[in-house]
Amino acid sequence: MVAKILVVHGPNLNLLGRREPSIYGHTTLEDINRNLVAKAQAASVVLDTFQSNAEHELIDRVQEAMNDGTGFIIINPAALTHTSIALRDALAATNLPFVEIHLSNIYAREHFRHTSYFSDIAVGVISGLGAAGYELALQFALARQ
């Protein structure tokens, strides 16, 4: 049973709704979080959200998930997708299932965005579906209960 779900948002996602809306959409991070929390509450599941522009803070929060009752992680590593071995190692160390999510289709963008350090250890990857991708990841996590 998934006791708690953690949603982790990487660098620059605090700017959603304002940053390159043609790529990332007009939905704000606050809107995404509010929607996810409401859907989780309706399913009687606790959902925590965390955003940081600092890699070490993301790593610390992922490590905390090992001891705080988290049963599933939804993560949008943002640009760290293509660079952060340390965040990948933190996710692997938790031994918790996670879904990697991207608002844009990373494979239809610049070549350097085509490589993910997370996909091969994720239970699933959602890319290119905008904010709806978060809802789909949550549905998947809730179905694992």
UniProtKB/Swiss-Prot annotation:
Superkingdom of origin organism: Bacteria
Listed InterPro entries: DHquinase_II, DHquinase_II_CS, DHquinase_II_sf
SUPFAM superfamilies on file: Type II 3-dehydroquinate dehydratase
Catalytic residues of the enzyme: Y24, H102
GO biological process: amino acid biosynthetic process; aromatic amino acid family biosynthetic process; chorismate biosynthetic process; quinate catabolic process
GO molecular function: 3-dehydroquinate dehydratase activity
The protein's enzyme class: lyase
Reactions accelerated catalytically: 3-dehydroquinate = 3-dehydroshikimate + H2O
Keyword Cytoplasm: no
Site (Transition state stabilizer): R19
Binding positions for substrate per the UniProt entry: N76, H82, D89, L103, S104, R113
PANTHER family found in the cross-reference section: CATABOLIC 3-DEHYDROQUINASE (PTHR21272:SF3)
Function: Catalyzes a trans-dehydration via an enolate intermediate.
Record family assignment: Belongs to the type-II 3-dehydroquinase family.
Protein name per its UniProtKB record: 3-dehydroquinate dehydratase
